[in-house]
Amino acid sequence: IVMEQQHKRIIKEALNVLGKKNFAFIAHAGSFPAEEGKNTGFGSVASNAGKTLVDFVSGIFNAIQLGPAGKTKSCDSSPYTGTIFSNNPLFIDLGLLTTPEFFSLLSEETYNKICENNPNKDKNKTAYSYIYKAQDEALREAYDNFKKNNPFKLVEALETFKKNNAMWLENDALYEALSIENGNDYWPIWENEDDKHLCNPKNQEEKERFAARKAEISEKYADEIEFYAFKQLLASLQNERTKEYALSKDIRMIADRQVAFSDRDVWAYQALFLDGWMLGCPPDLFSDDGQAWGFPVINPEKMYNEDGSLGEAGKLMKALFKKMFVENPGGVRIDHLVGLIDPWVYKAGKTPKIEDGAGRLYSSPEHEFLKKFAVATEEDLNEEVTADT
């Protein structure tokens, strides 16, 4: 303990000499440590080991920067293609669910079995495929016990959570139900054409038909939809618990906002994206052809209305960042910042090369299509032309 205090004192002195007020520890939540014998295959900031790490960095760092917290897919572990609103259920600490604080929703037997069967329990690496399935099964057990025991405090919390987060939760949960209905979670290949566009009707007839379909699916998969909300509630409760503990140690959590949108988000908000255009990276020293990321791009014309008020896309982005700042008092890191300020866009099916029509979304005044989005800068002004010319 004495040595640890000495190290912290020396580091503080060094930061003062360097004139640094902020010093952040960076770690993706899935990489957080686990206690001996309690390794499920995926880290959690909310775990006891997570608290120990917070204790360790306290006094040296004043913030912890986490990776993107969105829900990932079974076939894609990258947090940079996760959901923008829903939290990843993999970050829920199962150990906490066995405690009275969480009404012993999960049996210790199930928890211990998951830890014991973890194929990477003795390795410093996650077991993504394993825990993706095991975590969902464990949370299903917790949900069944929730319905069986009906703890009033948690029932009340769930209803409040659903009401306060209806703007995004209803769509995300509905997508889960539609994925079951259509046999896969990738909406572009769903056989039911209406299901592909339920949140984006183009006329009154579609609006009425889609509303009826939503009601049908919501009734048919009511339990699955409630289960989805239940998992999001648990993630939220544990996140709040972690935030409060970290703040008590003078540590603030920093979020990470990726430039991508998940399949679930594209489905829900597809009318807000620029049709036929994708986000990528221009040719550079690392790639002669550039990088075709395939991420959708927010339509600039949907960001603001003609009167200057926020458009539908603007409201979406405001809601997203508001949620992130509330959950993360340390702020938000934006991955690939230029992708938000002035993204490099290319035509779907083409390369991200200029000769194939690619360009900067907000600074291509001579581009046949993109010029209407160009924002004039000081360098664009002809200073030789005066008002009297």
Give the location of each predicted region:
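Catalytic domains of carbohydrate-active enzymes, especially glycoside hydrolases
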Residues: 17-18, 45-73, 323, 327-331
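Conserved, mostly hydrophobic/aromatic
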Residues: 57, 66, 175, 246, ...
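A short N-terminal beta->alpha junction/helix N-cap motif
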Residues: 40-44
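Hydrophobic faces of well-ordered beta-strands that scaffold small-molecule active sites
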Residues: 23-27, 62-65, 253-255, 332
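Generic structural signal for well-ordered alpha-helices
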Residues: 50-54, 143, 239-243, 321
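Short, flexible active-site-adjacent loop segments at beta-strand->alpha-helix junctions, enriched
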Residues: 70, 181, 257
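Conserved, well-ordered alpha-helix/loop/beta-strand core segments that scaffold catalytic motifs
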Residues: 228-260
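Alpha-amylase-like alpha-glycosidases and glucanotransferases acting on alpha-linked glucans and related
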Residues: 4-39, 75-236, 260-389
